[in-house]
Every structure is written in C-alpha cells, then in structure tokens.
Amino acid sequence: DAGFVLARLRDLPTDDEALGPVMDLEQVGIAGHSRGGKTVGRACSTNPDYRACAVLDNIGPARERMTGIDQPFLTLRSAWDDARVAELHDYLGRTGSVAHDVVLENSNHFSCTDIPLFVAEVRLDGVDPASGIESCASILEAFFATFLTNKIAVATNWLPTGEVANVMIRRFQARAGD
C-alpha cells in the first residue's frame, strides 16, 4: 500500500549519494489512475505526509467524498456525464486546501496511460496516443512542481499554457471557515 512504500523510503539511509539529491521526503506527492485514484484519496485522507494528491479519471472513496481532502488536490479526467461531474464537484468543494478539476478534451479513461499505445481498441480516432500521455505528464508535473513547493498562494495559473491543448479547468477554494 502507499503508506508502506512511503515508510520504506523513510528507512533508506539519508546519506545515500544516489538518492539523497533527488528525494525530498518532506515534499511527497501521490497520483493514481482509476482504482489507484481511490487509493490516492484514502492515502491523502489518512496520511498528511502526502503534500499534494492527483487522481486520474476517478473520484475518491465514499468516506472521503463526505469529508474532502486537506491537501492540494487535482482531478485530471476525460469528459463525464453531468451527474458524475456534480458528484466530483461536491467532493472537491469539501477540500481543506485548493482543488482543481481538469478535463482533457478528446480523451477517454485510458488517455493518461500507456495502454492506448498497445491496445488499439481503446485508442481514439485521430488522436495520437502519445499526445495524451504527454499532456497528462505536463499537467501533473506542473501541479506537483507548484503544490509541493509551497506556492499555493500564487498557484492560480499553474497549468502549463501553450504546452497542453484542449483543456478545461475549474478551481475550488478551501472549505468555508478554513
């Protein structure tokens, strides 16, 4: 589980020459696709060591939908029906920090993964499978670079404009009273 992995990383020697310069365990983010997105929701609700959380094409578990998440939160998804979008926005509206709903147009459930590179049945006509991966990677990189470096106060325009086409974004503020 995600907590086990983070605990094992903390067990590594801090003077390790290979990992020391690239691994800052005070600024850990977590991302997950589909069922892994539910894992992200649970991990973030139970472990404040995750400083930013990203879910690809899913909504968090039922318990977290009622309470929200306290860390900066990103949902990166394909187009959904109105009822599912309303459910997501209700969840994101319960955030204790900031939350973003980013819709990658001309995408499907698998567009942020490498599956369309290998499985023709999930490819979208006229859409290069690599472009979905590149767009998602750019968005995730910008999100984590911003929200893991304590730039929350200036993080209204963190999305990499010009690098990612066909994106819609909606921002949610912290819960009232926070």
What are these regions (language model features)?
Residues 106-108, 115-178:
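Alpha/beta-hydrolase-fold serine-hydrolase catalytic core, especially in secreted/extracellular enzymes
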Residues 17, 27-29, 52-54:
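Residue in the alpha/beta-hydrolase core beta-strand immediately N-terminal to the catalytic nucleophile
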Residues 2, 28, 101, 144:
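Divalent metal-coordination and catalytic microenvironments
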Residues 31-36, 40:
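Gly/Ala-rich beta-loop-alpha elbow adjacent to hydrolase catalytic centers
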Residues 42-51:
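Conserved hydrolase catalytic core segment
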Residues 51-112:
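The feature captures the conserved acid-bearing segment of alpha/beta-hydrolase catalytic domains
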Residues 7-14, 45, 145-149:
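Sec-exported extracytoplasmic/periplasmic mature domains
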Residues 1-25:
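Alpha/beta-hydrolase active-site loop
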